[in-house]
Regions:
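Small-residue-enriched flexible segments
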Residues: 1-50, 59-62, 67-353, 358-366, ...
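Contiguous, structured surface segment used for ligand recognition
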Residues: 56
Length: 411
């Protein structure tokens, strides 16, 4: 199989950006190394173009008649190989050369049919959807691998999603023409689609992992039997006698949570702690904001339902830790595709990649424009890639924050 054609552009007028995208796609499809007739497109636009989403989709689909299926969303930024368009107009498109019987585009109004066995799925979500975390879990259960990858739309306007199936507009969309908001949409893939996916966390633990010994909805009341607020102040070396300093530090602090497993009808602590021996978070850790303090019970409120038996560690965003972990997952992907103990002809080649990163990681977070994508290019190589900066990242059956999800398609 050949490389996936991809393109990206920015311009104040979407028509000119689309013109540049089409020129890039057509030039690549004319090259022997790239697929000449792919039928599935991924499209990501920045929120500067959100109000023009329908016109953009109509134009691109008319100019690319062989492409019968479209999926995508909007973000505060979009990405491509070696470049980011963050908080500015931007379009990124990739054309996937995958057999038609190995994928299905779906949405909330045109859900995945029973006739297709999904092995995994790329999922785009609207953050305003009620019970989103539960919907993601339910969607994961509908796949053979119980693994999803994707993200939650981000931007200043209402979330926009794209979904068109092979026979035109998806049933139920009516005049929407493949552009809508709310719920989940994406692409389900069959078992014959070869891919490797990894999650990278962007926060560094600044405390030991502790067990939640009392909780009330989203309030952590005690940690290891002590008032949670007292534990946090001690771990962060803070004093309420210096309230401004304490408030500033708490605002920049998050929590890494590992929910307890359900075993034998009773809640028990995870076999693993939130913090690995290497000092970083594993895939099972969910990073969430501290949203308030409870002086009466000396507890802390977090942006997640918590329960007794969960593991918790305080953490902070850390650029160096994020860079190192991003390089790590790229190295793991390359190792899986090019294991040292295989002959050269057994090496798999990357056809294309999708990267969903947190909007909090984009822009200046890595020190300079497009720095995150440049790290991926140096570590993974010069491969076709598109992506989006999301307000929540989807991996496995969960919603993550301050993370990145890198997925590569292989031959």
């Amino acid at each position: 199989m050949k490389l996936f054609p991809y393109a990206h552009a920015t311009h104040p007028q979407w028509q000119l950006a689309a013109l540049l995208v089409l020129a890039q796609l057509r030039s690549q499809m004319a090259l022997p190394a790239y697929a000449a007739g792919p039928t599935l497109a991924l499209i990501y636009i920045t929120d500067h173009y959100a109000n023009d989403a329908q016109d953009i989709l109509d134009h691109l689909s008319a100019e690319l008649p062989l492409v019968t299926d479209w999926s995508g969303t909007v973000g505060i930024g979009v990405a491509a190989n070696n470049v980011e368009y963050f908080d500015e107009p931007g379009i990124a498109v990739m054309l996937l050369d995958i057999p038609a019987d190995q994928y299905r585009v779906f949405s909330g109004v045109a859900p995945l049919g029973l006739g297709f066995e999904a092995h995994t799925a790329l999922v785009h979500a609207d953050g305003a959807t009620p019970d989103l975390a539960e919907l993601v879990q339910e969607m994961a259960l509908r796949t053979e691998s119980n693994y999803l990858f994707g993200g939650v739309s981000s931007g200043r306007e209402q979330g926009v999603q794209f979904a068109i199936s092979g026979d035109g507009n998806m049933s139920g969309h009516g005049a929407a023409g493949g552009v809508f908001s709310g719920g989940l949409s994406g692409v389900a893939f069959g078992a014959e689609v070869s891919m490797v996916s990894r999650l990278t966390q962007g926060c560094k633990p600044v405390s030991a992992s502790r067990t939640i010994t009392e909780a009330d909805n989203n309030v952590v009341v005690t940690l290891d039997g002590e008032p949670a607020l007292d534990v946090m102040l001690r771990d962060l070396s803070l004093s309420l006698e210096r309230p401004q300093e304490a408030l500033q530090m708490v605002r920049s602090t998050l929590v890494g949570l590992v929910h307890p497993l359900e075993m034998g009808g009773e809640k028990t602590a995870q076999a693993t702690t939130a913090v690995k021996q290497t000092g970083n978070f594993g895939n099972e850790v969910l990073v969430r904001h501290i949203v308030g303090l409870d002086p009466g019970r000396r507890g802390i409120a977090v942006a997640e339902f918590v329960e007794k038996g969960a593991q918790l560690a305080f953490c902070q965003r850390n650029v160096q830790a994020a860079k190192a972990d991003l390089i790590r997952i790229c190295a793991e992907i390359r190792e899986e595709l090019e294991p040292e103990d295989t002959t050269p002809h057994a090496t798999k080649r990357i056809q294309g990649a999708v990267y969903v990163s947190c909007s909090g990681r984009g822009g200046p977070h890595f020190g300079e424009p497009s720095a995150e994508m440049q790290i991926i290019r140096r570590a993974l190589g010069d491969v076709p890639l598109v992506g989006v900066f999301a307000s929540g990242e989807i991996a496995y059956d969960r919603l993550y924050g301050y993370s990145g999800v890198l997925t590569v398609f292989t031959d």
